[in-house]
Amino acid sequence: MKIYQCAFCGADIPPGYGIMYVKSDGTVLRYCSRKCFVSATKYGRNPRKLAWVRKLQRKQKQSTS
């Protein structure tokens, strides 16, 4: 089984979880949660400007090191 990464926050998505969003041009985007999906598609937010995304990325970086 392949583990995908969230297109918004970069978190790992285990098999059977998350949201797969297919755009009209055929591009597949995978999101770990509804929060990431709505932030990216409905609100058009930039993940680099959100504190919770930066906190999650720091946590993941520490766990891999």
Curated annotation (Swiss-Prot):
Needed cofactors, names only, are: Zn(2+)
Q: Give the molecular function GO annotations.
A: rRNA binding; structural constituent of ribosome; zinc ion binding
Which Gene Ontology CC terms are recorded?
ribonucleoprotein complex; ribosome
The UniProt record gives the binding positions of Zn(2+) as 6, 9, 32, 36
Q: Could you list this entry's UniProt keywords, alphabetically sorted.
A: Metal-binding, Ribonucleoprotein, Ribosomal protein, RNA-binding, rRNA-binding, Zinc, Zinc-finger
Q: Which InterPro entries match?
A: L24e/L24_sf, Ribosomal_eL24, Ribosomal_eL24-rel_arc, Ribosomal_eL24-rel_N, Ribosomal_eL24_CS, TRASH_dom
| Biological process terms in GO annotation | translation
What domain of life is recorded for the organism? Archaea
What is the cofactor note?
A: Binds 1 zinc ion per subunit.
Keyword Cytoplasm on entry: no
Biological function: Binds to the 23S rRNA.
Similarity-based family: Belongs to the eukaryotic ribosomal protein eL24 family.
Subunit structure comment from the entry: Part of the 50S ribosomal subunit. Forms a cluster with proteins L3 and L14.
Identification of the protein by name: Large ribosomal subunit protein eL24
**Species, as recorded:** Pyrobaculum arsenaticum (strain DSM 13514 / JCM 11321 / PZ6)
Instruction: Cite the source lineage.
Output: Archaea, Thermoproteota, Thermoprotei, Thermoproteales, Thermoproteaceae
* Gene for this chain: rpl24e
